Amino acid sequence: MPLFTEAPKSLCILRLSAVGDVCHALAVVQHIQEYYPQTEMTWIVGKTEMGLLSSIPNITLIPYDKKTGWKGVLSLWKQLKNKQFDALLNMQTAFRASILSLGIKAKFKIGFGEKRSREGQWLFVNRRIRDPFSPHVLDGFMAFAEYIGVPKAEPKWELAISQDDYKFADQFIDFSRKNLLISPCSSKAEKDWLIEGYAEVANIAHQHNINVIFCSSPAKRELEIVEKITALCHFTPTNIAGKTNLKQLTALISKVDLVLSPDSGPAHIATTQGTPVIGLYAYHNPLRTAPYNNLDNVVSVYEENAQKEFGKPSSELPWATKLKGKNLMTEIQVEPVIGQMKKLGLF
């Protein structure tokens, strides 16, 4: 029996970060909106991620900056002090999110099921979803919608990207040939692939007359990595590292033919735009974290390393098992990456 048999008047979504997970959450939010169009929706989201979601219709977005500490928590509580929700969907297990939830008034506070709940989230909720059979994060999020009475459906996304964003992207696209976007950096250095690997792939793509574009955030580490990669290229690729905001990046991703990326936000943005993406994985199970509609395109060494570390297949390991080996991403070879590019018709 679902929690609601008719549309709730108001819902609050709590998912702060990161960009990829916010993309997953957006599919859930828009699915709920489609089924319950009269329900008033409020989403508490991270300050950075807000840049991707702004201007989406029929939802109130409240940004939270984790750098503000308790001051930010109290400010958020003050904004919501006169607001009462039918339910809070707490889609983030981080303790910080649970603390934020204390100041959100809702009859039902819904959290993850036993297998996916972490950092004591169960102490802050009064309802828990059923863990889905599928290990993917997005399916876990979709279980929140099902719990409140929204039938299952394939995820869809509609981001509010402006014509100015698309015009910005156009200046980097070569419309006379195919375009490859390489986003080489993850949020943690251990999840990055080899600089030499990216450079070799870029050189091979260039030999096949592909327009190669590099992107990254403005973070110093990421800018330095892109600089090192491009220094090994036998041509001059288009380098827009640190030069785009999230919406401009989304516009660019929507126009390229393929994205190559480790576990990162741009990989999941590609899924929202229907752009094929090759994800590179070693430390996290790609069946859980890879771009949702591109699981078949993954190049991964996770399974064999899980067998080495635990002596059993990943299907028998706890849901969020992260491997501990050193430099596992170095085991990813160039050949299977090129093989995926050929399979996807890049050349």
Swiss-Prot record:
It is an enzyme of class 2 (transferase). Coiled coil: none annotated. One of its GO terms (cellular component) is cytosol. Keywords: Glycosyltransferase, Lipopolysaccharide biosynthesis, Transferase. The keyword Transferase applies. It comes from the Bacteria. GO terms for molecular function: ADP-heptose-lipopolysaccharide heptosyltransferase activity; lipopolysaccharide heptosyltransferase activity. Its EC number is 2.-.-.-. The keyword Transferase applies. Pathway: Bacterial outer membrane biogenesis; LPS core biosynthesis. One of its GO terms (biological process) is lipopolysaccharide core region biosynthetic process. Pfam families: Glyco_transf_9 (PF01075). Belongs to the glycosyltransferase 9 family. Catalyzes heptose transfer to the lipopolysaccharide core. It transfers the first L-glycero-D-manno-heptose to the phosphorylated 3-deoxy-alpha-D-manno-octulosonic acid (Kdo-P) of the inner core. This is Lipopolysaccharide core heptosyltransferase OpsX. It comes from Haemophilus influenzae (strain ATCC 51907 / DSM 11121 / KW20 / Rd).
